[in-house]
């Protein structure tokens, strides 16, 4: 606008472009949902009972393998096949 008073030629209107969700509270769905892939992981550890080497191969997502890692570091122990046959299962022989 130029001058003291607004006249029709002085008013410039431009089209305002807004995303659809701002106008009607709709959410835009993502084009492709990224699903995590299951990848193979090889875990080398030691038997909790006799100390022999154990290798376990699993397929997991990145989140899954990180959770499994935390379990192995804090609350979960692995046994070799020989030791697992000698241990009682859930209080049974």
Swiss-Prot record:
Source taxonomy: Viruses, Monodnaviria, Shotokuvirae, Cossaviricota, Papovaviricetes
Quaternary structure and partners: Homodimer. Homooligomer. Interacts with host RB1; this interaction induces dissociation of RB1-E2F1 complex thereby disrupting RB1 activity. Interacts with host EP300; this interaction represses EP300 transcriptional activity. Interacts with protein E2; this interaction inhibits E7 oncogenic activity. Interacts with host TMEM173/STING; this interaction impairs the ability of TMEM173/STING to sense cytosolic DNA and promote the production of type I interferon (IFN-alpha and IFN-beta).
One of the GO BP terms on file: symbiont-mediated perturbation of host cell cycle G1/S transition checkpoint
UniProt-recorded Gene Ontology molecular function terms: DNA binding; DNA-binding transcription factor activity; protein domain specific binding; zinc ion binding
Primary location recorded for the protein, binned into one broad class: host cell
Record keywords, A-Z: Activator, DNA-binding, Early protein, G1/S host cell cycle checkpoint dysregulation by virus, Host cytoplasm, Host nucleus, Host-virus interaction, Inhibition of host innate immune response by virus, Inhibition of host interferon signaling pathway by virus, Interferon antiviral system evasion, Metal-binding, Modulation of host cell cycle by virus, Oncogene, Transcription, Transcription regulation, Viral immunoevasion, Zinc, Zinc-finger
Record's GO cellular component terms: host cell cytoplasm; host cell nucleus
Location(s), subcellular: Host cytoplasm; Host nucleus
Region (E7 terminal domain): 1-39
Modifications made to the protein after synthesis: Highly phosphorylated.
Function per UniProt: Plays a role in viral genome replication by driving entry of quiescent cells into the cell cycle. Stimulation of progression from G1 to S phase allows the virus to efficiently use the cellular DNA replicating machinery to achieve viral genome replication. E7 protein has both transforming and trans-activating activities. Induces the disassembly of the E2F1 transcription factor from RB1, with subsequent transcriptional activation of E2F1-regulated S-phase genes. Interferes with host histone deacetylation mediated by HDAC1 and HDAC2, leading to transcription activation.
UniProt domain comment: The E7 terminal domain is an intrinsically disordered domain, whose flexibility and conformational transitions confer target adaptability to the oncoprotein. It allows adaptation to a variety of protein targets and exposes the PEST degradation sequence that regulates its turnover in the cell.
Protein name as annotated: Protein E7
Organism: Human papillomavirus type 48
